[in-house]
Swiss-Prot record:
The active site is at residue 50. GO terms for biological process: chlorophyll biosynthetic process; protoporphyrinogen IX biosynthetic process from glutamate. It catalyses: (S)-4-amino-5-oxopentanoate + tRNA(Glu) + NADP(+) = L-glutamyl-tRNA(Glu) + NADPH + H(+). Its EC number is 1.2.1.70. Possesses an unusual extended V-shaped dimeric structure with each monomer consisting of three distinct domains arranged along a curved 'spinal' alpha-helix. The N-terminal catalytic domain specifically recognizes the glutamate moiety of the substrate. The second domain is the NADPH-binding domain, and the third C-terminal domain is responsible for dimerization. Substrate binds at residues 49-52, 109, 114-116, 120. This is Glutamyl-tRNA reductase. Homodimer. InterPro entries: 4pyrrol_synth_GluRdtase (IPR000343), 4pyrrol_synth_GluRdtase_dimer (IPR015896), 4pyrrol_synth_GluRdtase_N (IPR015895), GluRdtase_dimer_dom_sf (IPR036453), GluRdtase_N_sf (IPR036343), NAD(P)-bd_dom_sf (IPR036291), Shikm_DH/Glu-tRNA_Rdtase (IPR006151).
């Protein structure tokens, strides 16, 4: 397990300004891996997302491997290694395994449980395969990471429930309208929170976005950034009937949308529902709008209450997911240890079989003699080795106890070896 090494930066350790200098696109990731391979690194994988830039490696001297990975990471900036002092992730061995498991399970993301990271990891894995830097150790790590990610998603609620105000708004819009591809969103005002919510709804699949504000130049600037059209604020009552979602954020506590305007709007819409987000602080929508049957009004406090429920659910799911990851790390360690023991077990089996055949050849017609020969030969080497081990140790008692523990485990001996031997001697003297 000591062969795994990882160096990198992420949102938990490194400021965004520094992370941004190290971001790699797919061709740059591939080129980095090719350079590492040319420098003798047999296994490597590089992951670059908005949250992290991390390079994983395996094989050879861990210190030398770490130095190579760090050199390539710093060359991206380029930045001096000293600039990363105290601001980077630097892991070895089983800690690397646990880290990768947490990444694929979305436990290391800025938004706990976000679903996109697994696809990003798989893309990085494909790039590493194409670059020729995925060996058996890396492949084993990645397959185990995908398996635990699947378990976490299926056995916990880590990805359920929105946790930000904008995500809550998007979820409510989907619940109300279903597929958002045919919906129209009207952004009334250009206050920052309103823009953020409108942008999230746009990312959720809203078909059309119209920006309308008292100051048209500001509306045009926001519309250009969001790829939206601009509506005439003077014709607001004509814009509203086409809007399935209205996000209001003009600031200053001004009343931008009243009950009477919405009553007329709903009548023209034949009471088709409208989702309204009041993003103003203080509010910009007349509270009585919520009395209208087809108007679904949420202010920021309403959205925050739903988001808090989502965060609480994810916190509980996070604890469950971390427990699953810990179990998976332990299982991975056991599996790797068992695989490492396979050659020795095969050699032991071959040795025993050779001794069995020799004993049979020397006493082909005498089972008693053959079995005595076999037992004697099988025990001779280990017995001599144990005597030499105890005699050559400065702490003979300690080595004897360790040897007894090993023998009990190897041969499932039921009691203390010393006591068993003493009992056998006593029984023999009585005979």
């Amino acid at each position: 397990m000591d062969g795994y090494v990882m160096v990198g930066v992420n949102h938990q350790t490194t400021p965004m300004a520094l992370r941004d200098r190290l971001v790699l696109d797919d061709p740059a990731l591939a080129a980095l891996l090719v350079r590492l391979r040319a420098r003798g690194v047999t296994e490597a994988l590089a992951l670059s997302t908005c949250d992290r830039v991390e390079i994983f490696g395996h094989g050879g001297d861990p210190r030398a491997l770490r130095a190579l990975l760090l050199a390539e990471l710093c060359a991206v900036g380029p930045i001096e290694p000293a600039a990363l002092a105290g601001q980077m992730v630097d892991l070895r061995g089983l800690a690397v395994v646990a880290h990768m498991f947490r990444i694929t399970s979305a436990l290391e993301s800025q938004v706990l449980g976000e679903p996109h990271i697994l696809g990003q990891v798989k893309a990085a894995h494909r790039i590493a395969r194409d670059a020729g830097t995925v060996g058996s150790a890396t492949e084993a790590l990645m397959q185990a990471a995908y398996a635990i990610a699947k378990r976490v998603r299926s056995e916990t609620r880590i990805s359920e429930g929105p946790v930000s105000l904008a995500a809550v708004a998007a979820q409510i819009a989907r619940d109300l309208h279903g597929d958002l591809g045919e919906t129209c969103l009207l952004l009334l005002g250009t206050q920052e929170m309103g823009e953020l919510i409108a942008e999230q709804l746009q990312m959720a699949g809203v078909g059309r976005l119209v920006v309308c504000a008292p100051r048209r130049p500001r509306a045009e600037a926001v519309a250009a950034r969001l790829g939206a059209s601009v509506g005439d604020h003077g014709a607001l009552l004509d814009l509203l009937p086409n809007a399935d979602i209205v996000v209001v954020g003009v600031g200053g506590g001004l009343l931008a949308l009243g009950e009477e305007a919405m009553r007329r709007t709903l009548k023209r819409r034949r009471n088709r529902p409208v989702f309204i987000v009041d993003a103003g602080v203080p509010g910009n929508v007349e509270p009585s709008v919520q009395r209208l049957e087809a108007a679904f009004l949420y202010d920021l406090a309403d959205l925050e209450a739903v988001a808090e429920e989502g965060r609480a659910a994810r916190d509980q799911a996070s604890r469950e997911a971390h427990a699953l990851v810990a179990d998976a790390v332990a299982a991975f360690e056991r599996h790797r240890a068992e695989r490492a023991a396979v050659p020795a077990i095969a050699a032991l089996r071959a040795h025993f079989e050779g001794e069995r055949l020799r004993a049979l050849a020397e006493a082909p017609d005498d089972a008693e003699k053959a079995t005595r020969l076999l037992v004697g030969r099988l025990l001779h080497g280990p017995s001599e080795a144990l005597r030499d081990l105890a005699a050559g140790s400065a702490d003979k008692e300690f080595m004897t106890v360790r040897a007894e523990m090993l023998l009990r485990r190897l041969f499932d001996l039921p009691t203390s070896i010393a006591e068993t031997g003493a009992t056998d001697r006593e029984d023999g003297s009585k005979g």
